[in-house]
Amino acid sequence: MSKAELKRLGDYIREVNVRNRDLKVTNLLGLSVSKEFMPSIANTIGTDMSAYKIVERNQLVYIADTSRRGDKIAIGLLDKYDNAIVSQAYTVFEVVDHEQLLPEYLMMWFRRPEFDRYARFHSHGSAREIFDWDELCDVQLPIPSTTRQREIVAEYETLTNRIRLNNQMIQHLEATAQALYRKTFVDNIDKENLPLFDIAEITYGFPFNSELFCDDNTLSPIIRIRDILSNKTETFTSEQVDKKYEINDGDILIGMDGAFHMTIWSGGLALQNQRIVKIVPKKGKYVSAYQIFYSIYDTIKQLESSIEGTTVAHLSDKDMKKLSIIAAPAKIQEESYSLFKTINKSVITCKKEIIKLTELQSLLLAKMGQKKATER
């Protein structure tokens, strides 16, 4: 798309600086690099809240300081609340005329990774790097007719809604699995504890050479601790390792440093990086991944909490060998295994659909920079 077809953003937006002088607005929000508003965790005891800025629905906010944010800029559109207050360090702005530019369309542009890179490149400073208001105003973007903007936004929101519905289904299925676990293995049965190592294969990750990590998706995907909760990765390697370091759908993964993230993997075949432990139920034991997951979950989180605040938490082989699984009589064990397997299959299906939908969102955002996508 030629520069002649792009518009200067500063001609369509203006800064807003309304303070909470009468203290009527109490909903204090923060802003994340995932470009979402979230309840603030700041300690506001003794803080003068009248100096905080008010944000109204369909206004936008960004944090000019781009330092230490992982090459991303924190920016968001307030669309879930009528109003809120944010730190006076944040910049609040709005679209001047919604008949020329839709806030939702603009927010889609801000979600593009190209915009993150642009903001980082145009940030200046020594101790802190700042993407200032003038730089934001100089952003060039395509602004099609509002009819076309609404069509693009509608496509994106359709994908967003499907992701939300899948997440709701996952929550429902996991709640069902947890209830089944409590009924089968906790309430009103004669049970015994079996060492985790007796009923599952435990594998610790391989120390891959990080210098070989890249974004070439024709190579082998590699899972690091930060990828556990998202069930996907954007990191790949050419390094070849033993098959025991392969991760498959249904394997339990636990991060061994910092927060002990846990998941039942659903992101497809991948490789297991160091400081991740993989747990796979042994065949013929009628023990499901869900049974293991819920048996050890509370213990893992208690261990994490006991270490937090003193040092960086580390999960050791010694810790793993202390874990045990609650086992029911053989018949109950076998019946529950089938139910857990069905639930797990449904959860994996939902998670895979979320990954595909997210990829479609990324594709739609990428097409915004192409002339054909904005014409109609």
Describe each PLM feature range.
Residues M1-N20, D138-P207, I326, A330-R376:
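Non-catalytic DNA-recognition/assembly elements of restriction-modification systems
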Residues E5-Y62, F197-L212, T218-D251:
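Sequence-specific dsDNA recognition surfaces
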Residues L6, P103, A177-Q178, N193, ...:
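Alpha-helix initiation and N-capping motif
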Residues G10-R14, I63, T91, M107-R111, ...:
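Generic alpha-helical structural context detector
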Residues Y12, P103-E135, V287-L323, R376:
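Short, positively charged
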Residues R57, V61-R111, K243-I300:
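A short beta-sheet element
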Residues A84-A89, H124-V153, A270-V277, G309-Y337:
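A short glycine-rich beta-alpha junction/loop motif
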